[in-house]
């Protein structure tokens, strides 16, 4: 099922853990609508701006999958409102900065990105059609969350330190 021009339901529900453990990771109709919103409101604008394919690392997660991976059942992933992704050749911090300044989102988390490796980690972003989006921006280093994104120096569109 095509969710938007460049994104399919299959890539938003794919999970190696679900496959390995025989977990049904099929979203309901409301979850699919939320996934469509994430695609149209966030992923398509990001793809258009960077003009590169996006690799989804985690999209929808059923309650059973959340339990299997130790994620909260209240996660926005469990409602189809959140996605984790990367763009090959684009530092994740650059993607996060662009999202923070250019699209409507509920929560944006730069996860496991280190100053000495701006391409490391991944971007988590969510969208909530039902209410006002919080525009919450966090950085997670694997131990704790900090408000905002790390300060980085840029030159010619590249992170320099």
For each feature predicted by the language model, list its residue ranges:
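Structural recognition of the beta-strand scaffold that forms the well-ordered cores
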Residues: 55-57, 82-86, 124-126
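Short, flexible, solvent-exposed loop/turn segments with mixed acidic/basic and small polar residues
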Residues: 68-78, 113-116
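A generic structural signal for short, non-catalytic loop/turn and secondary-structure boundary residues
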Residues: 2, 49, 78, 117-118
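Extended, low-complexity, intrinsically disordered C-terminal regulatory tails
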Residues: 44-70
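Extracytoplasmic cell-surface/polysaccharide-interacting catalytic and binding patches
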Residues: 1-49, 142-161
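Acidic, His- and aromatic-enriched active-site or binding-groove loops in soluble protein domains
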Residues: 73-93
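Amphipathic alpha-helical interface surfaces
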Residues: 38-42, 65, 81, 91, ...
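Catalytic cores and adjacent binding grooves of peptidoglycan-active enzymes
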Residues: 87-161
């Amino acid at each position: 099922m095509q969710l938007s021009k460049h994104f399919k339901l299959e890539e938003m529900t794919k999970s190696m853990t679900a496959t390995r453990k025989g977990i049904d990771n099929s979203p309901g109709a409301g979850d699919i609508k939320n996934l469509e919103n994430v695609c149209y409101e966030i992923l398509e604008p990001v793809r258009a701006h960077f003009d590169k394919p996006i690799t989804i690392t985690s999209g929808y997660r059923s309650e059973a999958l959340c339990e299997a991976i130790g994620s909260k059942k209240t996660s926005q992933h469990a409602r189809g409102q959140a996605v984790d992704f990367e763009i090959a050749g684009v530092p994740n911090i650059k993607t996060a900065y662009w999202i923070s300044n250019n699209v409507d989102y509920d929560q944006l988390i730069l996860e496991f990105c280190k100053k000495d490796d701006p391409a490391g980690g991944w971007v988590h972003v969510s969208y909530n059609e039902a209410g006002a989006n919080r525009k919450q921006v966090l950085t997670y280093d694997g131990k704790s969350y900090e408000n905002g994104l790390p300060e980085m120096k840029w030159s010619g569109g590249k992170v320099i330190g």
